[in-house]
Structure formats: structure tokens, C-alpha cells
């Protein structure tokens, strides 16, 4: 699937990401997840960051994967989930540890 083309479809995609996160994460991890997305992209599926850097970052989570440039919202969600699990581990509830990822963002002073 590709990115939604209009504002209404983008709004629906964001609602779907939030709903998926809400049913798969604890409340605390859900809050951390949402703060990460807000900090990284302001919930913009088409966000492009690191413009002056060697590699641009794309999507909700600002990942430096060219394949995410046109990836739909669910692909972006699961790619980042996989990244967080492998980089920061899981919680006792087997959630991706978004709070550790958020802590890392804050300690590095990013966003």
C-alpha cells in the first residue's frame, strides 16, 4: 500500500495507527509511543527530516529507510515497532519499550 493522497485519508490512517497502538500497548507505552510520533513528525505520514544530512528520514517515526518514503501507515508502525524491540527491548508485558526509546530521544536532545 502507498501513502494516502488526501487529508481525509491521512486523518483516517492516523486514527488507525493510534487505535492499533492503544490495543497493543499498555497505557504508559501508548503515551510514550504517541509522544515519540509527535516529536518526530507531528503525526505527518509524509514528514521528511534530516534534510541537510547524508540520509533523509521519513514518515511518522523519521526512520532513515528509503523504503519508508512511500510506505503506508501500518508498514511504518510495524517497522518502528521492530526497531524499538531490537534496540530497546520489551517490557514485562511484551510491549516494545517505547518509553526507553523516548528517554533516549530526550537524553540526546533530539527534537
Protein language model features and the residues they cover:
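Export/targeting segments at the very N-terminus of extracytoplasmic proteins
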Residues: 3-43
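Catalytic and binding regions of secreted/periplasmic enzymes and modules that target cell-wall glycans
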Residues: 31, 35, 46, 50-61, ...
